[in-house]
């Protein structure tokens, strides 16, 4: 990237595809393209986190601004950068409109919290800190300012959304998948989906290393074998966090290979494809897929739900993620129980005149003029406020 000739060639490649009509680009691992070629010495015992030494290097933002000036600004296109490990105070630099670099940046904040935090209260049944998750999204929203955020809970490098942030137990799978759908489609920012999450596809949970295709999983397993590590524990962990959980064939229907192929695919099809598949869900008005479609239609029809501001409500509630979306025409309140247990939520306002627009149970809870409302496990409600 330091070479002007290399950058010019990259810009020619971008123009080639834009001239063919592509709508935009995802820029993978974009914080890492600039390096400090003075190669400073570091003491890994003192600085175990080497991220600052290979990320956000000199002239990174000069390169991105130049790319925008030479290519992106000349086309009707969109750009999104992958920014793993990028903090909010650095993330805004990529997408602030006045800086003219990228349109969007997605971070790994939710994945990191799911992996690295413990339950706020074990009694809630949430295995990570929902309070930390709420703080993280509030911090990013504040840092982005007039820029445009992204929102996602799963991708090709993450386990399935419903298995990770909801529950794939049969009694909760559909409810929690719908609740998470409401979350993604009522937050500020552009929502991103991994194909299959709109069906409620779940982790496959392989039991043998031979079933895995992911090179990271295989390499780590070999390393444990060499060093005498606990390979059984590792395989149990991979059932929850392994990347191949999200890479199984898309479940089009209930046939042998889920309608994905007539030949045996590279990864085993999830056995639940006979229940969780597009053909079946298209015919079921109460399916996760049709709930997703209703939520998308609702979002598109309510501009203030897209562009309105974001503000946490009942921020210290360890079970409920609730927030206001305040716009120029209408205000909305989203209330989401992230727990497999009943929860109480205090809206601090009269909801008796509010209109429930979207709900994942047959009927929403009764709202009183004051006091908390009772939420069922994984219940989600979107209110349009009076």
Regions found by a protein language model. Give the residues of each.
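Active-site and adjacent substrate-binding regions of carbohydrate-active enzymes
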Residues: 1-386
């Amino acid at each position: 990237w330091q070479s002007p000739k290399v950058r010019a060639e990259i810009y020619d490649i971008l123009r080639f595809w834009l001239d063919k009509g592509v709508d935009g680009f995802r820029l993978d691992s974009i914080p890492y393209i600039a390096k400090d070629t003075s190669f400073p010495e570091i003491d890994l015992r003192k600085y175990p986190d080497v991220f600052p030494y290979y990320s956000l290097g000199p002239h990174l933002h000069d390169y991105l601004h130049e790319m925008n000036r030479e290519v992106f600004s000349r086309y009707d296109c969109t750009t999104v950068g992958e920014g793993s490990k990028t903090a909010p105070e650095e993330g805004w630099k990529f997408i602030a409109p006045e800086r003219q670099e990228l349109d969007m940046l997605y971070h790994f904040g939710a994945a990191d919290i799911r992996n690295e935090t413990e339950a706020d209260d074990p009694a809630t049944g949430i295995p990570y800190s929902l309070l930390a998750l709420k703080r993280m999204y509030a911090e990013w929203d504040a840092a982005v300012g007039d820029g445009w955020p992204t929102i996602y809970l799963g991708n090709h490098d993450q386990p399935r959304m419903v298995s990770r942030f909801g529950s794939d137990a049969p009694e909760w799978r559909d409810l929690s998948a719908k609740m998470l759908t409401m979350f993604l489609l009522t937050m500020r920012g552009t929502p991103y989906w991994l194909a299959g999450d709109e069906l409620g596809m779940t982790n496959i949970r392989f039991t043998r290393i031979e079933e895995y295709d992911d090179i990271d999983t295989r390499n780590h397993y070999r390393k444990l074998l060499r060093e005498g590590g606990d390979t059984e524990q590792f395989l149990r962990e991979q059932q929850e966090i392994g990347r191949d959980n999200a890479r199984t064939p898309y479940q089009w229907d209930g046939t042998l290979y889920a309608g994905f192929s007539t030949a045996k695919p590279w990864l085993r099809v999830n056995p639940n494809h006979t229940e969780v598949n597009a053909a079946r869900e298209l015919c079921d008005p109460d399916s996760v897929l049709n709930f997703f479609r209703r939520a998308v239609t609702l979002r598109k029809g309510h501009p203030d739900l897209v562009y309105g501001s974001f503000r946490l409500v009942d921020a210290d509630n360890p079970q409920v993620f609730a927030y206001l979306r305040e716009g120029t025409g209408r205000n909305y309140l989203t209330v989401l129980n992230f727990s497999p247990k009943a929860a109480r939520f205090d809206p601090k306002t009269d909801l008796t005149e509010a209109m429930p627009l979207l709900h994942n149970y047959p009927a929403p809870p009764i709202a009183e003029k004051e006091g908390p409302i009772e939420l069922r496990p994984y219940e989600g409600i979107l209110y349009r406020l009076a």
